Amino acid sequence: MPAPHRLYPRSLICLAQALLVWALLAWAPAQASQELTLVGKAAVPDVEIALDGDDWRWLARKRVLTLGVYAPDIPPFDVTYDERYEGLTADYMAIIAHNLGVQAKVLRYPTREQAVGALESGQIDLIGTVNGIEGRLQSLRLSVPYAADHPVLVMPIGARRAPPADLAGQRLAVDANYLPRETLQQAYPQATLHYFPSSEQALAAVAYGQADVFIGDALTTSHLVSQSYFNDVRVVAPAQIVTGGESFGVRADNTRLLRVVNAVLEAIPASERRSLIYRWGLGSSISLDFARPAYSAREQQWMANHPVVKVAVLNLFAPFTLFRTDEQFGGISAAVLQLLQLRTGLDFQIIGVDTVEELIAKLRSGEADMAGALFVNAARESVLSFSRPYVRNGMVIVTRQDPAAPADADHLDGRTIAMVRNSAAIPLLQQRYPQAKVVTADNPTEAMLLVADGQADAVVQTQISASYYVNRYFAGKLRIASALDLPPAEIALATARGQTELISILNKALYSISNDELASIVSRWRGSDGDPRTWYAYRNEIYLLIGLGLLSALLFLSWIVYLRRQIRQRKRAERALNDQLEFMRVLIDGTPNPIYVRDKEGRMLLCNDAYLDTFGVTADAVLGKTIPEANVVGDPALAREMHEFLLTRMAAEREPRFEDRDVTLHGRTRHVYQWTVPYGDSLGELKGIIGGWIDITERAELLRELHDAKESADAANRAKTTFLATMSHEIRTPMNAIIGMLELALLRPADQEPDRQSIQVAYDSARSLLELIGDILDIAKIEAGKFDLAPVRTALRALPEGAIRLFDGLARQKGIELVLKTDIVGVDDVLIDPLRMKQVLSNLVGNAIKFTTEGQVVLTVTARPDGEAAHVQFSVSDTGCGISEADQRQLFKPFSQVGGSAEAGPAPGTGLGLSISRRLVELMGGTLVMRSAPGVGTTVSVDLRLTMIEKSAQATPPAAAAQATPSKPQVSLRVLVVDDHKPNLMLLRQQLDYLGQRVVAADSGEAALALWHEHAFDVVITDCNMPGINGYELARRIRAAEAAPGYGRTRCILFGFTASAQMDEAQRCRAAGMDDCLFKPIGVDALRQRLNEAAARAALPTPPSPQAAAPATHDATPAAFSAESILALTQNDEALIRQLLEEVIRTNRADVDQLQKLHQQADWPKVSDMAHRLAGGARVVDAKAMIDTALALEKKAQGQAGPSPEIDGLVRTLAAQSAALETQLRAWLEQRPHQGQP
């Protein structure tokens, strides 16, 4: 082991080397630094700080605080010139040094890193202009912030839209000394970062197109923009980064210095902080306040739905709105819109217009959402909604610089005054100076040109506009002569009526803008010729103020020592008082309902935040003022009334009072529960009143809505009762006749001849009941929107002739002349639903005959061509009793009737005919109008515009065509019939055989496709729902084969055939490639008609009409099926009937067995398909109960996932119905004569 004394020289050498390295490191920054003279605010304020004795002794020993700054400058925080250091940081450093009783020393370093190294080595005590992010990265301890640091985004003033929130694809320019790269990359990972040596260079890069977006702190950005780039860039949005504000940084171990610096900073009053901000021209910066107002949920939703708002502005309304030579929008309104953009996040798209009329038209048409600047007047308020005015300016008189020009307002009578067209001041001016002549111009420039050219003596304009135009365009020619005694003009934003959310958003945003900001914007555009003086112009004054401040500090130094002794005692009392006041403030402001306190003269002494929020005002606007003076209600008359009520209340009563009141605030009526409590002093003398209210508008509206809902429910119940009573009466009346007459007929002896008159009465009553039910169904269909017309080619003359023939006999019975008059020129056939048109005419003619006892009923038809259409009018006139106007208003309501003549008594019928007729005419696109007078008669006119159809030379009337149709076909079609249900297949085949067609049948889609490939068919009729290849797939495959290259056949006609009567079934068939859809069951005549239509479309031979069917047998029909349907389908062919029914019975029995097996296997899709098959079989014999059960089972089984008791019951019911149907069908067949019997 080496001797200890040999280690000493080596240890000393190492120690000496370490000291040398430390000295070199400390010497290097010291040599690089430059000492500057601190130039702070001239009048440095004294603040009360609480430090203990150790801190003051430490400061006495310290004597000097060294502040480190670095290049480049960060204005307005750091500004250096001529070895002087000033700026916002310098001002705060001067306050700290002054109040701590130490000297301030400033050392400037070339870089931030050198300044931080000097701080770590102890060469300086603190470093300025450090935000929270920088402090954390550099391991510094930061003081409380002395200035806000809101990062903001800046774009060129010509940018149309705000950048995307994540700045994706944007070139982001940033000061290298502002935010670390890691922070920016985390906030904007998709942006491209470009670092610059200073904020000014980074901002210039955006101004001149080298970068897209600049990010910097709000104060520095606002200072640079206002000083150098006001016309080039604008702040568009706050950045999504929180920095914590600008602070002083000290070493992490220097806690004492941090404590004393914080003590001074925290003691600086808010007024002094504002004064320092104003000192550097930042008091009205648009970048200092980014707090958004509290928007409601509906307002936030509106802004989310309308991110871009179109703003209409006048092209020349300087200095409010103007477009510079580079087409950039500017002016006072442009600056206000920038403020609103920051507070709303909306993107304003500017639309320039030339006149106020054009601007208002765009607002009302929706081409623009709002106006950027518009004078407020009563006429415009009737069509527009105005925001809070952001400029109020008096009116002035501008005249020529001529002794003969009017000197003031008293000399305007008899003079010619130029004004902007539609100016709000024109009626006021004409009222005040009736002898003056007013001429108008399109804009202020033209109005002033009229004065400059001698065409007018004076122009009346706002002071701001007048100053702007005179200074810039008419200097030396025009002058502002005097102010005008008219109400000040108000400039505001405007929207169309109904834009409730938008105008509320704008008002909230405007209220969040301080008056200082608005005043600064206005002053910037007032048109002053000279630039405001800078710091250099005030250097001597500032030095003088600093000297006076130091002298004042010496004079008050003696007072400070004395006051310190009292401060400690006072602070204890103040703290207790402040605690009590804070408790009272929280108690009052925390109450959600408005509360106020007024003295006995009605002046406001105290109010809570809820009161201010209700009226949207600040405390300064109401404190110390009466209700009329503050006028928060917006109506001076209402304000005076409320003030007088309050004074009367205090004078008359001393007891608390609680009452409900309706009050109108800013045009809105609110229902409130108001309370007032007079209060006095300890001697009982009245001092004022405490009051407040609870807004119960929503509760009152809910009660009103509940009452309205009850009234609506009662009305609906009464209507239901009336309807049921009417229906009961209308149904029971014919039923009484039917039952009574049939009962009498049954009571007659069997060998006696039947009473034909009784049977006729029963028959007529049954027809009346059938018409009633039909009318009710028509009304229900029309009201449900499910009533479809079926327009076809119709001979116009045939419609009225049919109505005349129908009612001719009834008219003869009543001795009434029934006349048809036609005036049809150039119109033959039209496109109309003949059945429904005949229904309308029958109702009108029948009503006319019903209410006419003598005279005549005239049906007049007039038709004239109108382009490609025809204007047709049907008019029914009678000489009956007539109808009063009151009764006419009721006639077109369902079940409404009016009496006939006094002798005739009540009118027969249901009261549905006219209601149905009017609705049918409206569905046809026409109108039905009634004109009538009591004792004169009634005329009902139907006006229609119908499509004309050219009449073919070979056209044959329908009746003649029917007669000319041969009984046997000359040429038949080749028809492929596909159905997996054998009764349906057999029936359709027999029907087509009867029509003379050549039929090939297939019981599956696969078999049909094979037959279609082997043979050529003209028509294919396929069931839609089949196992395997269903009808839709079969149609698609046939159409695909026809579309293939080399297909040599003629395209066949494809019909779907289905028992599903859903409204969209025909659409599904056409979508699959079919030509049309047929619905089961279908009669022979209907089948022939559809084949005729298909043959005509495809140019196929037209199938002939069948021979007339044999008369139907009138055997009694069992309840489970319809014998009439069977007879109609089979044309009363006995052999076909028996063959059809045997096949139905056999197939139903097999389908029921298969259904039960599938039900046991829980194969629900196949259960649904089998139910559909059973429904199709039931439709053949019109077994309604079985059809309903099968359809219900089909619907229930679709999508079923597990066992269902309801399906179990439906399967059992369907099986029982099938068995009952088989029994009844066999019994019915036994009753019929066999073929060959007589």
Swiss-Prot record:
Periplasmic face residues: 332-541
Residues spanning the signal sequence: 1-32
Positions bearing 4-aspartylphosphate: 1023
Topology relative to the membrane: Multi-pass membrane protein
GO BP annotation list: regulation of DNA-templated transcription
Cytoplasmic side: 33-307, 564-1238
PAS domain location: 580-651
Domain HPt: 1133-1228
TM spans (from-to): 308-331, 542-563
Swiss-Prot/TrEMBL keywords: ATP-binding, Cell inner membrane, Cell membrane, Kinase, Membrane, Nucleotide-binding, Phosphoprotein, Signal, Transferase, Transmembrane, Transmembrane helix, Two-component regulatory system, Virulence
Catalytic activity: ATP + protein L-histidine = ADP + protein N-phospho-L-histidine
Function noted in UniProt: Member of the two-component regulatory system BvgS/BvgA. Phosphorylates BvgA via a four-step phosphorelay in response to environmental signals.
Protein name: Virulence sensor protein BvgS
Organism: Bordetella parapertussis (strain 12822 / ATCC BAA-587 / NCTC 13253)
